[in-house]
């Protein structure tokens, strides 16, 4: 449950621990990214070319949104103590991984779009061989003939208590592309908290 997740972040857990919990319950990542509510498919360790993405979430309607996620631990500050220094090295690693995925998808867009729609159908039909979760709606109302909307998200580290405004400016400044987002685990938990506040578990 979300309390277990919050505990991991408060304990400044390392990446492996956080990854393990999310892989055991992919709804954490899916709830963070799904729009509309409950309409998603989430994969872990998803192959993109010869690389592997930590998580991929498929969501939206008509034009499918493909969210490609790399995560790091909660055992460092997302932005360095001197905010002129930019992001922590672990976040830069995540961004490099995402840029590799971005380059592959941009070069092989058509085949990737075909692959992701095929894997979406396999997951819905319970035929996908990897670790995945299909949302409670059990389907995605997306059109395989339309382009896909690919977003890249790096999640890692925790916020410094006194630097939220400078930190948000720093994160925006460090974004290498409009479709690449950077988030701390604090912002991840805030969004999940808000989500579960609006959609309490029945």
Language model feature labels by segment:
Residues 1-202:
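Charged, terminal alpha-helix-loop-beta segments
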């Amino acid at each position: 449950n979300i309390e277990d997740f919050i505990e991991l972040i408060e304990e400044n857990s390392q990446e492996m621990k956080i990854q393990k919990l999310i892989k055991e319950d992919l709804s954490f990542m899916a709830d963070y990214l799904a729009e509309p509510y409950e309409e998603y498919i989430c994969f872990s360790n998803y192959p993109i070319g010869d690389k592997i993405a930590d998580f991929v979430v498929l969501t939206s309607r008509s034009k499918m949104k493909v969210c490609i996620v790399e995560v790091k631990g909660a055992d460092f500050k997302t932005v360095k103590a001197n905010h002129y220094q930019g992001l922590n090295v672990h976040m830069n690693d995540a961004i490099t991984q995402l840029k590799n995925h971005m380059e592959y998808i941009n070069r092989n867009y058509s085949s990737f779009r075909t692959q992701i729609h095929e894997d979406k159908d396999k997951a819905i039909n319970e035929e996908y061989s990897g670790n995945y979760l299909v949302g409670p709606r059990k389907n995605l109302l997306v059109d395989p003939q339309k382009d896909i909307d690919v977003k890249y998200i790096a999640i890692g580290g925790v916020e410094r208590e006194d630097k939220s405004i400078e930190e948000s400016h720093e994160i925006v400044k460090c974004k290498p592309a409009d479709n690449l987002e950077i988030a701390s685990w604090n912002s991840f938990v805030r969004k999940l908290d808000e989500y579960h506040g609006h959609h309490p578990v029945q």
